[in-house]
């Protein structure tokens, strides 16, 4: 039981800032549209993953811009 509890606490899918949920969802929908991906259970992991990967790239780019590029 302790292992199961510890696994839940390490879930990386939880947003650190819950208020960002709608912005992340909007970004996901925009990227899916750009890529021509129809999100859903019937969509392949590769297609869904491409959207997630692009979200990550864009969030990293935004963070770097907000930091003034100090970590290049």
Swiss-Prot record:
The residues annotated as site (Cleavage) are: 30-31
- What GO molecular function annotations does the UniProt record carry, in alphabetical order? double-stranded DNA binding
For this entry, list what GO says about its biological process: DNA topological change; sporulation resulting in formation of a cellular spore
The record ties this protein, via InterPro entries, to: SASP_alpha/beta-type, SASP_alpha/beta-type_CS, SASP_DNA-binding, SASP_sf_alpha/beta
Supply the alphabetized keyword list: DNA-binding, Sporulation
Similarity comment: Belongs to the alpha/beta-type SASP family.
One further remark on this entry is: SASP are degraded in the first minutes of spore germination and provide amino acids for both new protein synthesis and metabolism.
- Task of the protein: SASP are bound to spore DNA. They are double-stranded DNA-binding proteins that cause DNA to change to an a-like conformation. They protect the DNA backbone from chemical and enzymatic cleavage and are thus involved in dormant spore's high resistance to UV light.
Q: What is this protein called?
A: Small, acid-soluble spore protein C
């Amino acid at each position: 039981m302790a292992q199961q509890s510890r696994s839940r606490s390490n879930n990386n899918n939880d947003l650190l800032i819950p208020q960002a949920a709608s912005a992340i969802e909007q970004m996901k929908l925009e990227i899916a549209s750009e890529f021509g991906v129809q999100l859903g259970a019937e969509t392949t992991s590769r297609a869904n993953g491409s959207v997630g990967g692009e979200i990550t790239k864009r969030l990293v780019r935004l963070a770097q811009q907000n930091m003034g590029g100090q970590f290049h």
